[in-house]
Design a protein with these regions (language model features):
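Bacterial N-terminal signal peptides that target proteins for export
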Residues: 1-8
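C-terminal motif of bacterial Sec signal peptides marking the signal peptidase cleavage site
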Residues: 16-18
Length: 164
């Protein structure tokens, strides 16, 4: 019985090696990859995923200068970023790590700040209540019960308003 279990586990391990490289990531790695991929080009994302060990992947992020962007925050703030609970007062960096690049963005004039921007994000709402950030070419949008937008106003790189 133990031998069969060992063989089954070995088989599952061998099958997983050839699978999607994202599935190889530990929960912690997936968390920082998900937050930091917004700052990586497609080539950098692929290079990150090609690294064989967690140590190599972590060193890769450090070499790109991205590691501290996420780990500068205390654990409770990192958890808020990962859960997507964007709130007024958040920095632009935290917003981008939580929701990624916006669907659309515009410079705003006439506000009492040095720099003001409007970021528009699209979301998919699914039957089970999940919200997924919509991206161009989404493969899940057809399952959504609705697609809606949220507008975020950034004043001097700080979230000032969230509408929608």
């Amino acid at each position: 019985m133990k031998r069969q279990l060992g063989i089954a586990l070995l088989g599952a391990l061998l099958l997983s090696v050839g699978c999607n490289p994202i599935k190889r990531l530990s929960d912690t790695e997936w968390d920082h990859y998900r937050a930091l991929r917004v700052y990586m080009s497609e080539d950098e994302r692929n290079a990150f995923l090609k690294n064989k060990t967690e140590e190599e992947r972590n060193e890769f992020l450090q070499a790109l200068g991205l590691w501290d962007r996420f780990y500068q925050y205390p654990e409770d703030v990192r958890e808020l970023i990962l859960s997507g609970d964007v709130a007024r007062g958040w920095t632009k960096d935290k917003l981008l790590m939580a929701w990624g690049r916006p669907y659309d963005m515009q410079k705003l004039a006439g506000r009492d700040t040095y720099r003001s921007e409007r970021y528009i994000y699209r979301f998919e709402e699914h039957e089970d209540g999940r919200l997924i950030i919509w991206t161009k070419g989404s493969k899940t949008a057809y399952k959504a019960i609705r697609i809606f937008e949220r507008t975020v106003i950034l004043d001097d790189d700080v979230v000032a308003e969230i509408k929608g």
